[in-house]
Amino acid sequence: MREHGPQSPMNLPAKRVVALAVLFLAVPVAWAQNPRVEFKTNMGSFALELYPDKAPKTVANFLQYAQSGFYNGTIFHRVIDGFMIQGGGFESGMREKKTRAPIENEAGIALKAGLKNELGTVAMARTPNPHSASAQFFINVKDNGFLDYREPSPQGFGYAVFGRVVEGMDTVLRISKTPTATLEQHQNVPQRPVVIESVALKPAK
């Protein structure tokens, strides 16, 4: 199985597979303020602020998963210190959860609106197909500009940023430093599961 998510600069493939994806057409919702989502994990809590005006379909998709309870009990299954932490698709034991149809990649419009893959931002994980993101996401623990949109090609489409950590970055960094190992075909899996215990909308500030 191909790993969902970005690859570090030292592990980028020379060629990527191009495939058509079914697009999930999320209806943008008008927000008086940017929504905030609190994650409680077994290693501490953190909060994300989301930007529906800059990545509307991506935010609508993420909130639908969050509000349905989909992320509760999932794990951060791929952790690379000095790069990013990735979660939202597997339960303990690397049991993959069934997701809805993938969504359109908004990396280009998000970049034009000022959202970049930099320290503390959250973006959608995907396969080599640019339009394959569904539920998995990652949080950058350093500036990763090479993940930003460059051109409309499989190699250049980038990863859509849709929010940033506004509370608990110390928790995110602590997760990024957890020891990892290879579990079957999955690399960079925390040896001690990092469990997302709950995800909830919180009042915007």
Model-derived regions: residue spans:
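Bacterial N-terminal signal peptides that target proteins for export
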Residues: E3-A19
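Cyclophilin-like peptidyl-prolyl cis-trans isomerases
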Residues: L12, F24-K205
